Amino acid sequence: MREPLERFMEKVNFSGDCWEWGAARQKKGYGQFRAGTMRQAHRWFWEQTVGPVPEGLELDHTCKNRACVNPIHLEPVTHEENIRRADSPS
């Protein structure tokens, strides 16, 4: 059986600045990845490459691409900040 990270990497398109998730997605466009349980792909990959998301924070896609899993395009922010950024123009 292959390791979760190996399976994950096979599902990512690394051809651009955004590392686009190429497998299952939620209705809102976030990638989904099963590693024991179903997880948001960007959050799972962040935890594997950067570490835990600080308690009380969530990951904002600074690139505005919900399918992106590139850790450089993710920033831990409060829920309120994430909502504020979502409502602002790119």
Stretches found by the model and what they are:
Residues 1-90:
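Conserved recognition-core residues within compact binding domains
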